[in-house]
C-alpha cells in the first residue's frame, strides 16, 4: 500500500504543478457547479419536467437517490479511512485554489456524488450517458486540480458513486410498489396460425380452445373480457368446424366481452408491401364488423418490427393507438412504455410498448392452480417482480398486465388472481379489462419517437428472416404486383365487376402474411405444403383474370398490343414477333406494338454492350463497370459475389468462416444483340464448402460446385443495367450476397419501405446488453441508393428484402439467399436464447436452382433517387404483350416526377376510382 500511496502523491503533485490560469478557472467552475450536487439537482428537475407525470418523478428520484446515497456513503467512509488532505500531508504542497475543506480526503465525496448522479441518469437516458459520465469524470479531475484530493480519492469516489448509481433504479422500483396503481389485466391469447405445427394441426387445438372460452365467458361474469390477439381469421377457422358457434361469438363481441380485430392476420409488417397492410386492415375490419365490431386499439402481438409510415396508415383507418411488444432500442428507457409514434408524414398515434412482452403478467396464473389460497400465494410471490419490471416505464398510474401467450386458453382462475392483487397490494386497483380501457386511462404522452421501430434491446427483432427461404419473399412480391398493378386497375377500368374475386385472392394471399409464415421461420411442411398452393392459386387465378379483363379493354382484334401497368408514358422492350422490340407505351393503358424511335444497342467488343446512354464492360467473373457516355464517368465494380458461412437458424444469421468471393473467377462469356436488347451471359462455378463442420464453428474444407449464370442486359434507351442471376445451390449453411461498389463515400443512404423512402445511417452502432444487438443487414423494398446528383448508384431488386451498406458508403450488398438447417438454435452469440423450438428444417437450406433479378441505376446529373426509383419501378413492372384492336387508350395518367402510383381500385359505394 505504501507504494500505491507514494505513486498517488507523485501523480497528485504532477497534476497540481501543471495548473495554469485557464485550467484553474475551469476547475474552480466545475467544482463549484457540483457543490452539493447543484448541477445534478437541476438536471433531475429538468428530467422531471421533460418527462412529466409519474415517470418524470421516478427519473428525478432515481438521480437524487443515486446522488444522495453516494455522497452519504463517501462521507461515512472518510471516517473509516481517515486519510489526510494532500495539502496537509505533503510538505511544501501547493495550497488549494478554493476554500480548504475540513473533512478527510478518501474517498472524494464530490466525485462520489457526481458519479452516483451520472450513472443513475445514464440508466434513465442512455443516449446522454457518455455526456453524464464525462461530466462526472471532469468533477473528479477538478477536485485534484484545485488541490483538495489525491487521484486515488477521486477513483474511490467514482467507485462508490457508480455502485449507488446502479443501485438507484432497483431502489426506486421498490418505492414504486408503495404508490397507488391501476392494473388493467388483459386476458388474451397469441395464436400463431402455423409455425412449429401445420395449420390444421393447430386448428385441432384452436377449436376446443374457442369452445371453452365461449363457455367461460357465458358462465362467469367476473371474467369480464378476453382479447383475441388483434386478428379475426382464427374465428373464421373455428367456424369452419363449428358454424353453430357464430351467434355466441356475435353476442359476446357486441357485449364487449370478446375483443377481435382490427387485423385479418398478424402479418410481418416489414416484409409485405404497404398496400398489403392496408388490405389486411380492410379485411380485418370487414370480418370483425360482421361479428359486431372491431377493437379500437391496433394491437399487434409479435411482428418483427414496425414500418415508419404505419401511424399514417392507422390514422387513415381512424385509429389513434397502437400496442406492440418488439422493436424498441435504448430510446425505450427515455420514452417509457407510452409515447407518441410519428411517421414521416407527420401523423401520430399513441404507442404502448409492452416492455415485459405480451406475457408480462402470465406468472400470476398457472394451469392447475385452482384453490384460492394457492392463487393468492402465487400472486404474492410474482406480483413484485411484475411491478418492478413495468412500473418504472409507466407514464401515469395505469399498468398493462397481459395474461396470455402463444396458443394459451383463458385461465379460469384469473378472476381469483385479480382479487388477490388487491389483497396483496391494497394500493393497486386491478380489474380484468380491455386494451381500449387501458389506452383511455393513459395520460397524453410527452415523448415522441419518429420512424421505424426495428431494434432489439428488450426482445430479439429477428431480422435474419429477411433472407430466409427467399423464394417466399419473391413469390409474395410477384403476387402483390399481380393484384395491385394488373388485376385491380384492369377491374376498375372495366366496370369493377370482379370485386369479390379480388377479395378472395387477397384473402388467400393474406393467409401467407403471418410473421411465422412469410418470414420463413416455420417447419418445412408449413412452407412447402401449405404456403405454396396459396401462392399458386393467386398466381393462376390472377393471371387468368388479367387475360380476361385485358381482352375486354383492348377491343376485338388480333393485332399485337402492349399493356403498361404504370400511369406514365414509357419506352419498354417487349417481344414482338419473337424479337425484343422497343415500344412507346401509353400511361396505364394499351398501345399498338409498333417499334419506336431509338438508336438501338450494340456490342462493339466481346463483353461490351452499349446504348445511347450507357456502356457496360463485363469481366469474366461476371462483374461489370458502367460508363456514363454523357459525362464519361466510370462506376465502381458491380455484381461481385460474396459467400459466408452461416451457423445461425431461420431467425438469425450467425457468421462462420471462411468467406469466399467470385472476384477473379474465370467464367465462360457470350455476347449477343437481339433486336433492341444486348445481353452478356457469364457462366462460372463457385467452389464453396459443402456445409459446416460438426462443431458448427466453421465450414468444412470439402468444396462442392455451385454453378452461377449471369445474364447482364441493356435495353435501348434504358438508364439501368438489368441482371438475372441463376444459382444452383449445392452447399449448406451459408449466405450469398451480391456486392456493388458505389464509387462514392457517404454517411447515409436511401432505402425503400412501405409508403416511404427512408434515409438511414450507414454505420450501425454497437450495443451492449441488448437481447439482440443491431446488425448491418436491414430490410428494404424495391430500392436502396447511396449518392445522388454527384454520383453513386441505386439498386433495384425483385422480391429480395435484405441489404447492407459499408460504413463509408463505398459498397452496397444485397443478400440473395440464406441456407440454414434449423428453425431455432440456442447457441448463437448474436441473440440470447431460443426464438422457437430447435427443429431441423432441411428445406430451408434452399438446395437447387434459384433465380434472382436485380438492376443497377447509375446516379448523377439528371438522375437522382426519384428518377432512379421510377426506373426501378419500370424494371419491376414489365409491360406485357396481348392482342386487341390496336387502338391506343390510356385509362389514367399521373404527371410530374417523381409521382408514383400505389393502387387503383373502384370505390365500393361510388361510381369512381
Regions found by a protein language model. Give the residues of each.
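Membrane-embedded catalytic cores of phosphoryl/pyrophosphoryl-handling enzymes
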Residues: 49, 92-178
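N-terminal catalytic cores of secreted or lumenal carbohydrate-active enzymes
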Residues: 179-279, 287-289, 316, 452, ...
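CE4/NodB-like, metal-dependent polysaccharide N-deacetylase domain
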Residues: 277-316, 381-400
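C-terminal (or distal) subdomains of carbohydrate-active enzymes
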Residues: 310-313, 335-337, 353, 363-366, ...
Amino acid at each position: 500500500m505504501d507504494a500505491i500511496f507514494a505513486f498517488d502523491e507523485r501523480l497528485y503533485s504532477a497534476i497540481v504543478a501543471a495548473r495554469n490560469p485557464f485550467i484553474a478557472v475551469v476547475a474552480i467552475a466545475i467544482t463549484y457547479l457540483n457543490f452539493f450536487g447543484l448541477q445534478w439537482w437541476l438536471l433531475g428537475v429538468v428530467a422531471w419536467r421533460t418527462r412529466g407525470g409519474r415517470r418524470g418523478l421516478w427519473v428525478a428520484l432515481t438521480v437524487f437517490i443515486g446522488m444522495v446515497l453516494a455522497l452519504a456513503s463517501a462521507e461515512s467512509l472518510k471516517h473509516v479511512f481517515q486519510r489526510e488532505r494532500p495539502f496537509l500531508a505533503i510538505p511544501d504542497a501547493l495550497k488549494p485554489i478554493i476554500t480548504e475543506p475540513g473533512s478527510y480526503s478518501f474517498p472524494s465525496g464530490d466525485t462520489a456524488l457526481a458519479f452516483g448522479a451520472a450513472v443513475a441518469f445514464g440508466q434513465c437516458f442512455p443516449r446522454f450517458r457518455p455526456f453524464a459520465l464525462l461530466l462526472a469524470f471532469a468533477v473528479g479531475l477538478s477536485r485534484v486540480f484545485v488541490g483538495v484530493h489525491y487521484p486515488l480519492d477521486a477513483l474511490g469516489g467514482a467507485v462508490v458513486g457508480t455502485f449507488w448509481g446502479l443501485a438507484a433504479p432497483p431502489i426506486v422500483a421498490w418505492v414504486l410498489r408503495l404508490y397507488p396503481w391501476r392494473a388493467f389485466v388483459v386476458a388474451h391469447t397469441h395464436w400463431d396460425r402455423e409455425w412449429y405445427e401445420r395449420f390444421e394441426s393447430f386448428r385441432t387445438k384452436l377449436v376446443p380452445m374457442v369452445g371453452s372460452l365461449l363457455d367461460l365467458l357465458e358462465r362467469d361474469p367476473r371474467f369480464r373480457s378476453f382479447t383475441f390477439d388483434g386478428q379475426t381469421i382464427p374465428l373464421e377457422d373455428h367456424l369452419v368446424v363449428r358454424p353453430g358457434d357464430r351467434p355466441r361469438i356475435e353476442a359476446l363481441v357486441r357485449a364487449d366481452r370478446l375483443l377481435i380485430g382490427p387485423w385479418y392476420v398478424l402479418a410481418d409488417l416489414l416484409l409485405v408491401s404497404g398496400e398489403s397492410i392496408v388490405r389486411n386492415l380492410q379485411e380485418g375490419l370487414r370480418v370483425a364488423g360482421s361479428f359486431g365490431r372491431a377493437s379500437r386499439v391496433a394491437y399487434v402481438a409479435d411482428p418483427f418490427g414496425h414500418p415508419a409510415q404505419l401511424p399514417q396508415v392507422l390514422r387513415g383507418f381512424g385509429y389513434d393507438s397502437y400496442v406492440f411488444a418488439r422493436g424498441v432500442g435504448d430510446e425505450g428507457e427515455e420514452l417509457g412504455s407510452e409515447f407518441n409514434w410519428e411517421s414521416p408524414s407527420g401523423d401520430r398515434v399513441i404507442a404502448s410498448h409492452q416492455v415485459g412482452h405480451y406475457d408480462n403478467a402470465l406468472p400470476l396464473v398457472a394451469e392447475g392452480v385452482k384453490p384460492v389460497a394457492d392463487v393468492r400465494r402465487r400472486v404474492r410471490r410474482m406480483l413484485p417482480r411484475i411491478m418492478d419490471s413495468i412500473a418504472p416505464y409507466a407514464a401515469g398510474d395505469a399498468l398493462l398486465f397481459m395474461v396470455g401467450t402463444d396458443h394459451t386458453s383463458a385461465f379460469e382462475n384469473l378472476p381469483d388472481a385479480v382479487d388477490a392483487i388487491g389483497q396483496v397490494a391494497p394500493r393497486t386497483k386491478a380489474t380484468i379489462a380491455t386494451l381500449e380501457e387501458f389506452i383511455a386511462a393513459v395520460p397524453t404522452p410527452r415523448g415522441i419517437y419518429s420512424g421505424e421501430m426495428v431494434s432489439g434491446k428488450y426482445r430479439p427483432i429477428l431480422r435474419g428472416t429477411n433472407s430466409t427461404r427467399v423464394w417466399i419473399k419473391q413469390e409474395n412480391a410477384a403476387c402483390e404486383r399481380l393484384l395491385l398493378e394488373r388485376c385491380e386497375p384492369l377491374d376498375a377500368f372495366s366496370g369493377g365487376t370482379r370485386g369479390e374475386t379480388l377479395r378472395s385472392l387477397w384473402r388467400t394471399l393474406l393467409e401467407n402474411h403471418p410473421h411465422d409464415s412469410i418470414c420463413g421461420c416455420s417447419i418445412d411442411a408449413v412452407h412447402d405444403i401449405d404456403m405454396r398452393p396459396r401462392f399458386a392459386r393467386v398466381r393462376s387465378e390472377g393471371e387468368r383474370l388479367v387475360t380476361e379483363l385485358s381482352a375486354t379493354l383492348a377491343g376485338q382484334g388480333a393485332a399485337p398490343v402492349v399493356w403498361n401497368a404504370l400511369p406514365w408514358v414509357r419506352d419498354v422492350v417487349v417481344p414482338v414477333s419473337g424479337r425484343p422490340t422497343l415500344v412507346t407505351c401509353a400511361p396505364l393503358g394499351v398501345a399498338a406494338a409498333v417499334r419506336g424511335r431509338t438508336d438501338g444497342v450494340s456490342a462493339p467488343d466481346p463483353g461490351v454492350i452499349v446504348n445511347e446512354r450507357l456502356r457496360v464492360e463485363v469481366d469474366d467473373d461476371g462483374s461489370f463497370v458502367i460508363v456514363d457516355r454523357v459525362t464519361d464517368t466510370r462506376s465502381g465494380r458491380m455484381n461481385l459475389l460474396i459467400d459466408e458461412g452461416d451457423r445461425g437458424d431461420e431467425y438469425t444469421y450467425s457468421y462462420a468462416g471462411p468467406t469466399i468471393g467470385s472476384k477473379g473467377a474465370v467464367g465462360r462469356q457470350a455476347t449477343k444483340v437481339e433486336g433492341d436488347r444486348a445481353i452478356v451471359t457469364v457462366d462460372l462455378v463457385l467452389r464453396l464448402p459443402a456445409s459446416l463442420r460438426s462443431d458448427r464453428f466453421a465450414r468444412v474444407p470439402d468444396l462442392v460446385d455451385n454453378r452461377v449464370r449471369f445474364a447482364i442486359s441493356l435495353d435501348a434507351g434504358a438508364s439501368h443495367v438489368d441482371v438475372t442471376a441463376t444459382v444452383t445451390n449445392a452447399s449448406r449453411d451459408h449466405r450469398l450476397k451480391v456486392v456493388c461498389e458505389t464509387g462514392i463515400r457517404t454517411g447515409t443512404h436511401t432505402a425503400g419501405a412501405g409508403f416511404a423512402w427512408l434515409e438511414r445511417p450507414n454505420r450501425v452502432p454497437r450495443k451492449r446488453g441488448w437481447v439482440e444487438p443491431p446488425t448491418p443487414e436491414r430490410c428494404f423494398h424495391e430500392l436502396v441508393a447511396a449518392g445522388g446528383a454527384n454520383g453513386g448508384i441505386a439498386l433495384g431488386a425483385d422480391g429480395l428484402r435484405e441489404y447492407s451498406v459499408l460504413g463509408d458508403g463505398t459498397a452496397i450488398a444485397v443478400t440473395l439467399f440464406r441456407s440454414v438447417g434449423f428453425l431455432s438454435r440456442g447457441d448463437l452469440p448474436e441473440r440470447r436464447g431460443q426464438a422457437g423450438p430447435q427443429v431441423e428444417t432441411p428445406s430451408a437450406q434452399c438446395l437447387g436452382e434459384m433465380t434472382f433479378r436485380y438492376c443497377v441505376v447509375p446516379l448523377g446529373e439528371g438522375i437522382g433517387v426519384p428518377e432512379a426509383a421510377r426506373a426501378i419501378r419500370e424494371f419491376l413492372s414489365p409491360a406485357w404483350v396481348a392482342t386487341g384492336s390496336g387502338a391506343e387508350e390510356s385509362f389514367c395518367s399521373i404527371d410530374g416526377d417523381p409521382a408514383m402510383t400505389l393502387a387503383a381500385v373502384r370505390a365500393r359505394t361510388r361510381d369512381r376510382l
